[in-house]
């Protein structure tokens, strides 16, 4: 049973790392928390490309 858990966690870590590597080169952002490069990128309706201090992410836009 513990071997199954270790294998499952390893596969999860590999998949998460692979998705992160893909997001590094992504220009547009189609889902919440996906990296974007500026306000000109295409976040979903109701989201804006907002700086988190280091990177930009699509976040809900609550108004001006």
Curated annotation (Swiss-Prot):
The keyword Disulfide bond applies. Expressed by the venom gland. Residues 19-27 form a propeptide. Disulfide bonds join 29-43, 36-49, 42-58. Transmembrane segments: none annotated. The keyword Signal applies. It is found in: Secreted. Residues 1-18 form the signal peptide. Its main location: secreted. The presence of a 'disulfide through disulfide knot' structurally defines this protein as a knottin. This is Neurotoxin lambda-MeuTx. It comes from Mesobuthus eupeus (Lesser Asian scorpion).
